Amino acid sequence: MNYSRFLTATSLARKTSPIRATVEIMSRAPKDIISLAPGSPNPKVFPFKSAVFTVENGSTIRFEGEMFQRALQYSSSYGIPELLSWLKQLQIKLHNPPTVNYSPNEGQMDLCITSGCQDGLCKVFEMLINPGDTVLVNEPLYSGALFAMKPLGCNFISVPSDDCGIIPEGLKKVLSQWKPEDSKDPTKRTPKFLYTIPNGNNPTGNSLTGDRKKEIYELARKYDFLIIEDDPYYFLQFTKPWEPTFLSMDVDGRVIRADSLSKVISSGLRVGFITGPKSLIQRIVLHTQISSLHPCTLSQLMISELLYQWGEEGFLAHVDRAIDFYKNQRDFILAAADKWLRGLAEWHVPKAGMFLWIKVNGISDAKKLIEEKAIEREILLVPGNSFFVDNSAPSSFFRASFSQVTPAQMDLVFQRLAQLIKDVS
């Protein structure tokens, strides 16, 4: 693929940082090399000397001596080598990307670690979006992505979707305003990429089926656009077998996949990873070299030690426990909604993730209801207009998260909300 046509002038202009290059060399160099190159501080002046973390199974992860010094030091902009290796093998096991054995020029799969999935997404958007570019999205969409893209000046086209995600026929109709060959003409403003959360979409909780993904991928091939597969809830799918991913069917090297460990290991450690064609991953890393320099070394080492301790089977067993927890939480909030909101509101059963998307009947705009009156009754929810490109337009929806609240709290919130809806109707 010709990736240069997708890149912004800023991204094309990025060059390797000479100082960061020495860090990459040091990460692969033999231990006896004497380096006066990097401006790394001497760990003797660091006040922290050791750390011990206790895992839920009672085992420990211990940092001391050289290992702890390394944890407190600068590291590779790609991510630490051992974590990169572990995550690459995980991607191969879970997705078996067709591009694994491609040459770099053909779109060979590569991977880099980012400071959380959001950091990776922002770098992807800044790599791809010029002012005036056309971007495909399915509304409602994740507000973090929406507000990262908006300042870059792109033109959004919303693709029809339902409780099974993007509707391929709707996407086909949107694309019919162009001819496939128009992608070779920059003045035609053909779509540069499709952005979507395929599993447990934030805020709707819906998931895209494998069959629909295949149809969408073929349309991406026909009209030559990229697919940004933002999948932070991949490990929170409530039914098995899990649906195949866009990455698993990417024969062209046109999928950029964003993964997160926030939902199953820790959100505060800020470790995510981006998988995609090598030439695009390199562009993301060049951005990291001059922004944050690298993801947090201590966070990466903590997660790496844990993953190697668990192994793939142990990690996936932990994922299954997380799924069981969130599935129970989902069932609790559905029971509370059915008890108090039946007849007052409508919702679909989330297939993954941690959100329930609710439409209030008989109210055209729930913004004031949620932002003012609900808070007066000591309940906090997110109004639906936050998840639309035109967030000034009225929306009768709101988002409820079921990740942290107890069943009793869910019941109380919906009891208060039901009374509030009745009061204003």
Curated annotation (Swiss-Prot):
A GO term for molecular function: kynurenine-oxoglutarate transaminase activity
Official protein name in the record: Kynurenine/alpha-aminoadipate aminotransferase, mitochondrial
A Pfam family the protein falls into: Aminotran_1_2
Residues with PTM Phosphoserine: S40
Role played: Transaminase with broad substrate specificity. Has transaminase activity towards aminoadipate, kynurenine, methionine and glutamate. Shows activity also towards tryptophan, aspartate and hydroxykynurenine. Accepts a variety of oxo-acids as amino-group acceptors, with a preference for 2-oxoglutarate, 2-oxocaproic acid, phenylpyruvate and alpha-oxo-gamma-methiol butyric acid. Can also use glyoxylate as amino-group acceptor (in vitro).
Residue range of the transit peptide in the UniProt record, numbered on this chain: 1-29
Record-listed N6-succinyllysine modification sites: K172, K263, K339, K367
Lineage: Eukaryota, Metazoa, Chordata, Craniata, Vertebrata
Native organism: Rattus norvegicus
Binding site for substrate: R20, Y74, Y142, N202, R399
Gene designation: Aadat
